[in-house]
Amino acid sequence: MGILSEELGPVVQRLVARPRIYADANVPAGLVAHMRARLQWDVLFVLEEPDLRRAPDVKHYQLAQQLRRTLVTLDRDYLDDRRFPPDCCGGLLVIQAPDERQLSGLLDRIDRSLFHPDAAEDPIAQPLIGRKLQVNTDWGRE
């Protein structure tokens, strides 16, 4: 029997390497389920947290930064650099598509392009630190 840290080390590394996401209230619950089940992202969903459900955007932005999570939203208000400066965040991803099916497809492409570049085995947990990215249904298509 080995030392606990030796046994758990590989498991911890896999957990740490998972993309860490803060999904705000504008993200549909079905999309959060897709992030968790299919993409294996570690998602904090504000609608599952009673204290955060009605919090203002600034609070979500600050909390995502404190928790070192990439904020994912459908809310274009976050594109205002004066209110939400990109250099102060753990990454901000504003996604846009007409329906949940297309949003899921968009997240699949984002996962491959940003979190698993060059078919890397271990994902990059926060590829957008200090940056904002606005993507729509045409993003990442060959």
Predicted region positions:
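Acidic, PIN/NYN-like endoribonuclease modules and their adjacent C-terminal/linker elements
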Residues: G2-L15, D24-A25, A29-Q40, P50, ...
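A general structural motif
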Residues: V16-R18, R68
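Conserved acidic segment of CheY-like receiver
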Residues: R20-Y22
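Short beta->alpha junction loops
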Residues: L47-R53
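Acidic, metal-associated active-site segment
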Residues: A55-R69
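Acidic, metal-binding active-site segment of PIN/NYN-like and related structure-specific nucleases
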Residues: Q65-R83
